Regions:
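Active-site and adjacent loop segments of nucleotide-processing enzymes
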Residues: 225-252
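Active-site-proximal segment of RNA-dependent polymerases
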Residues: 33-93
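Short, conserved non-catalytic motifs in the polymerase core
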Residues: 5-33, 47-59, 118-140, 163-166
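A common structural junction motif
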Residues: 199-208
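Short acidic, Pro/Gly- and aromatic-enriched capping/linker segments at domain boundaries
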Residues: 209-223, 234-237
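Conserved polymerase palm-domain catalytic core
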Residues: 70-178, 182-200, 217-223
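Short Gly/Ser/Thr- and Asp/Glu-enriched loop/turn motifs at secondary-structure junctions
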Residues: 4-6, 175-179, 213
Length: 252
């Protein structure tokens, strides 16, 4: 397989001000990306979690918005933590990604093509922001963290009278919007334990880091700011930066 080099350029996000390095692939490269992504789709559909919503057809912002709007009103939703994976796309370990794909993909020709496409990206690690295949691979990679949250964020409790051991979830809800992670729980103590575990899992298993400035807040005391909206128990608003940008565009 032969492709023209990927052309990279910088783009400043209008709301966050973050600088993104975007890769523009040749038409031939994009075709192979699409063919490979289509062939891998049964795997992606099986692995990507229900509440991973970014870049998933039929989900996206609208799906995340509906879910958060509903969950923020539940009596069990008392505290929340919003985590951000630092430089997610550039930090994805290709070694780990290839190991996961080797385990999950049985077709050697498809695996070889996937590895070849991954190796076209600049640097030794990371995926290409702007690539059709990369957005699916990123969701696939993070699905391991999502399922860890769903299946392993619990603690055991022993009944002193009967000795019976029961498991209780540390969180009530989890939602991934690509590298933004929302955890909702009943207590600050449980949520703190949950955050430590997912942070350790990301570091140890996926070689990713959580941004150190994450914090925990009480639902209703402050809004959940995610996917461009601010969520309160009794109403949902538009993030201020998006509203101001839309107003400026309208005035033009």
């Amino acid at each position: 397989y032969s492709f023209a080099p990927i052309r990279y350029f910088r783009r400043v996000e209008p709301i966050s001000g973050k600088i993104r390095i975007i890769g523009r692939e040749s038409i031939r490269h994009q075709i192979y990306d699409y063919v490979c992504g289509t062939a891998l789709m049964p795997l992606f559909r099986a692995k990507v979690g229900r509440w991973q919503t970014a870049s998933i057809p039929g989900r996206g912002i609208a799906d995340a918005r509906r879910a958060i709007k509903q969950r923020v009103r539940e009596p069990s939703s008392r505290v929340f933590g919003k985590l951000d994976v630092r430089k997610c796309y550039p930090s994805i370990s290709r070694e780990v990604l290839k190991r996961l794909l080797t385990r999950d993909v049985g077709d050697k020709r498809l695996l070889d093509l996937t590895f070849h496409l991954i190796d076209q990206y600049a640097g030794d690690d990371g995926l290409n922001i702007g690539s059709y295949l990369s957005q699916w691979l990123a969701n696939y990679y993070l699905s391991y963290a999502y399922h860890y949250c769903e299946q392993h964020l619990s603690k055991e409790r022993v009944n002193r009278r009967t000795g019976e051991i029961t498991a209780r979830r540390l969180i009530t809800h989890v939602l991934f919007y690509m590298d933004d992670i929302l955890l909702i729980g009943r207590s600050k103590r449980d949520l703190t334990i949950a955050v430590k575990r997912i942070r350790d899992y990301l570091h140890d298993e996926l070689r990713l880091e959580i941004h150190p400035t994450w914090n925990m807040k009480h639902v209703g005391a402050e809004p959940i700011d995610m996917v461009g909206f601010t969520f309160w128990p009794d109403h949902t608003g538009v993030r201020a930066g998006i509203f101001l940008r839309a107003r400026r565009s309208f005035r033009r």
